[in-house]
């Protein structure tokens, strides 16, 4: 069985995000980029399923500019067998919406015919948490979201997911779509030999037009601003002063 894993290039989680001077989006020039942490977990889970004998091939895919190839090479260095790059140069004012990404992944899934599609439950840049669900809807496949445990056999996937007050266990007929939670696994580090091998591997390149997918966006970003700075705290001299401020200023008493 083949597993298709979707990955995304984002600003590294350790970088302090800054807004562009023209307020059209987030500054990405000369900023460290990396694979979305939830996507790393998706790749790791696909590799573990292959190593357990539940899958025979792991194919990584991404949508983005030429620089996104670095993210695919990270997936290859981790152990993915092949990679597909859907080339798309982003327009800050017309972002690539989750529905457009889901349409592209649907087209790739129809080409690759995987038994399972795994992707992170969300990306840390936009936090949309929509692509996996939309992909399952477009493919008319069952879905298991926020997976914290995955067990795979030839015909079914068993997914454990954390819900309010406990753990929910669901059974999915394959093919299916699964989105990963942070608790699912701990991604491995790519070894230096595998990193070097990944640099020489050929990445298949296609465009949305090649896949016959319309990715035009109906949404326009009007303005992006940084959150307001938090006001400095005030040291109070007594409990009486605290109570007075809670009553007369905050009006919570």
From Swiss-Prot:
GO biological process, one term: fatty acid beta-oxidation using acyl-CoA dehydrogenase
Chief place where the protein resides: mitochondrion
Keywords of the record: Electron transport, FAD, Flavoprotein, Mitochondrion, Transit peptide, Transport
Similarity annotation: Belongs to the ETF beta-subunit/FixA family.
Protein name per UniProt: Electron transfer flavoprotein subunit beta, mitochondrial
Cofactor binding remark: Binds 1 FAD per dimer. Binds 1 AMP per subunit.
Function: The electron transfer flavoprotein serves as a specific electron acceptor for several dehydrogenases, including five acyl-CoA dehydrogenases, glutaryl-CoA and sarcosine dehydrogenase. It transfers the electrons to the main mitochondrial respiratory chain via ETF-ubiquinone oxidoreductase (ETF dehydrogenase).
One Gene Ontology term of the molecular function aspect: electron transfer activity
Cofactor(s) required, per the database record: FAD; AMP
Gene Ontology CC annotations of this record: mitochondrial matrix
Alphabetized Pfam families for the sequence: ETF (PF01012)
Domain of life (superkingdom): Eukaryota
Subcellular locations according to the entry: Mitochondrion matrix
Subunit structure: Heterodimer of an alpha and a beta subunit.
Taxonomic lineage from the root: Eukaryota, Viridiplantae, Streptophyta, Embryophyta, Tracheophyta
């Amino acid at each position: 069985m083949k597993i298709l894993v979707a990955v995304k290039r984002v600003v590294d989680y350790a970088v302090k995000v800054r807004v562009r001077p023209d307020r059209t989006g987030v500054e990405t020039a000369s900023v460290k980029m990396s694979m979305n942490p939830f996507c790393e977990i998706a790749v790791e889970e696909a590799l573990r399923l292959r190593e357990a004998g539940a899958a025979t091939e792991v194919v990584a895919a991404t949508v983005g500019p030429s620089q996104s190839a670095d993210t695919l090479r990270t997936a290859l260095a981790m152990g993915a067998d092949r990679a597909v790059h859907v080339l798309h140069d982003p327009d800050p004012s017309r972002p690539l919406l989750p529905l457009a990404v889901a349409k592209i992944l649907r087209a790739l899934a129809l080409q690759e015919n995987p038994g399972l599609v795994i992707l992170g439950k969300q990306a840390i840049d936009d936090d949309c948490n929509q692509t996996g669900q939309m992909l399952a809807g477009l493919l008319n496949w069952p879905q298991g979201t926020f997976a914290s445990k995955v067990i795979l056999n030839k015909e079914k996937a068993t997914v454990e997911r954390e819900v309010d007050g406990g753990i929910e266990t669901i059974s999915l007929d394959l093919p299916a779509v699964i989105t990963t939670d942070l608790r699912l696994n701990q991604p491995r580090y790519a070894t230096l030999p595998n990193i070097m091998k990944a640099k020489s591997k050929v990445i298949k390149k296609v465009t949305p037009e090649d896949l016959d997918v319309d990715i035009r966006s109906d949404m326009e970003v009007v303005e992006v601003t940084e959150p307001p700075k938090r006001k400095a705290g005030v040291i109070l001299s007594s409990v009486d002063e605290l109570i007075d401020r809670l009553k007369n200023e905050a009006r919570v008493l």
